[in-house]
Amino acid sequence: LSKISKILFILNNFVSKCHHKKEEKFIFPYLINKGGEEASLANEMINQHRVIENLENQLESNLNIKSLQKINQILTDFVMILDSHILEENSVVFAYAEISIDEFEKEIVLKKIGYFEKENSELCNKDKYLKILNEL
């Protein structure tokens, strides 16, 4: 259970509070403003972020009561949604973003993301999370 707690720590902090926040604050608004399929994709990704956060909360609750069967089911659900989410994000959503956001705006977005990462360096420190994973 201690290893699962460490994975949950990474999911809560890096995935939800850093990675998802950057997408929702800096990338998805452009797609939503574009409308059409781009907006639908961005909204679907945001909905999936909420599902992932819900699974994080469920996992935390079940870790606290040491419900191994439920923890196993939640982890299975995590694998399923993260697998499809990452595939869709990398193969479809970011392709639309690449096309939809002009070069000038991309520079602005990248600067804003860089500033966000500096302001949230504790949450967005990939090396810290890689170290935790390597220790598992």
List PLM regions with ranges:
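Small-residue-biased structural context
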Residues: L1-L136
